[in-house]
Amino acid sequence: RLSLVGSEMCIRDRNKTQHTHFVWDWKNYSMTTADNKKSSTDQQKEALRKAALEYHEFPTPGKIAVTPTKQLTNQRDLALAYSPGVAAACEEIVKDPSNAFRYTSRGNLVGVVTNGTAVLGLGDIGPLASKPVMEGKGVLFKKFAGIDVFDIEINEKDPDKLIEIIASMEPTFGGINLEDIKAPDCFYIERKLRERMNIPVFHDDQHGTAIVVGAAIMNGLKVVGKDLKKVKLVTSGAGAAALACLDLLVDLGMPIENIWVTDLAGVVYKGRKELM
C-alpha cells in the first residue's frame, strides 16, 4: 500500500510489517529515502508506478467527469432543462444548425478519438487500455484551455471503417482530436476526415509535436545565431510525429535537401524496399 502526501511517499508491505518512507523530487524525477539515501532505479520506478495507480483510482476512478453548467434545483429548472422547455432549443437548431453553438455545449466540446494502435511508448495496446491516456488528454484540454472533452475509444482497426465511425459523430463535437493511431493509417484517416467533416480535425501526434519541435528549433537557432535555411538536420525515426515535424520545418524554410531521415533500417531514400 502506498500513501502519497505532497512529495512524501510511504510504502507498506502486505503484512504491514515494513514501512519505507521516500521523498520524491517531482522536478528531477528522482527519489531519496527518509534518511537521505538515494533509492535504486527499480525502487523509483515502482514507487512512481504505485503513485500513478493511486492517483488514477482515488478518490474517484478515472480523471474526468461530466459537470452540469446549469442549475437543477426545482421543478422549473427541470422543465427548462428537459421536456417541455428543451423543445425550444431543438426547434431553433432545426431552423438554423449554427444555433447548436448557441444552445448546446458543442462549440466547446472536443472528441479525443483513438483506436489504441500506437499509444505513447506502449504500442498497440488496444482501445480499452488506451483510455487512461485519452482521459489524461481531456484533463490537459480542460486545465490549460478550458475545453471540454469526451474521450472516445473505438474498437476498429480498419481505416475506412474508422473514418465512417468518426465522421458520424460530427453533430456531437466542435472538433476532433485524433490520438495515438498508428502510421501510416493516421495520415490517411486525418486527410479523409478533413475532406469530409465541417469541423476542425487535428492529429495531435503529428501537429502538436510539430508545433513544439518547430518552436524549439527556431528559438535554438536564434540563440546560436544560425539560419534555418543553412543548417542540416538528421532525424531518428520516420513515424507520424517525425514526418509532421519535417513538413512544418520545410514550410518554415528548411531546404528538403538538407534533411536526412533514418529509421531502424538506416537512411530512408527513394527506392528503398526494407521496412517500406
What are these regions (language model features)?
Residues 1-13:
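Single conserved hydrophobic/aromatic residue that forms the stacking wall/gate
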Residues 4-5, 105-107, 229:
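Short loop/turn elements that form and flank the Walker-type P-loop nucleotide-binding site
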Residues 24-26:
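Tryptophan (W) side chains
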Residues 32-201:
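N-terminal ligand-binding/catalytic initiation module
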